[in-house]
Amino acid sequence: HFEENKLLHRREMRLADFVDRVLAGGETNDYYLTANNEVLSRPEFDLLLQDIGTLPALCDRAQLSARSSLWFGPAGTVTPLHHDTLMLFHTQVVGRKRWRFISPLETPRVYNYYDVYSPVDIDRPDLHRYPEFGQVKVLDVVVEPGETVFLPLGWWHQVSSLDLSMS
């Protein structure tokens, strides 16, 4: 899982080179520009941030670049089942993503391990190893360009890019 070992996989490269790689490649989970990349703090992205319309009252526009992440990658990228330690809004700009949500009330059946992760693969759950997961209710949503997901604190989720995707 990339997320668990992200520092081992992290590479620095020019954004233009990364975009070229994504556009030239096919469906893969081998490369993905993910959260906490600080790319939106760069002046080159000011116009993109200015294009964001009205924000909910709880969001501080002055903090937008510092508290936002740009996600970009090909179809086939998967963020494995985990929960976040903060609430977030995730806006789909290009392409579609499939989100699978699980209530935090189901945490004992999700087999939480390694801080915020689950060893269960929603696509191929090993019910012999994780039998309680068979009782978990999974909400399945496809998010289209222009749509925003609100993720409450502690909700488990696994996210898959169905298309080349920017969020």
Predicted regions and their residues:
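N-terminal accessory scaffold of Fe(II)-dependent oxygenases
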Residues: 1-148, 156-167
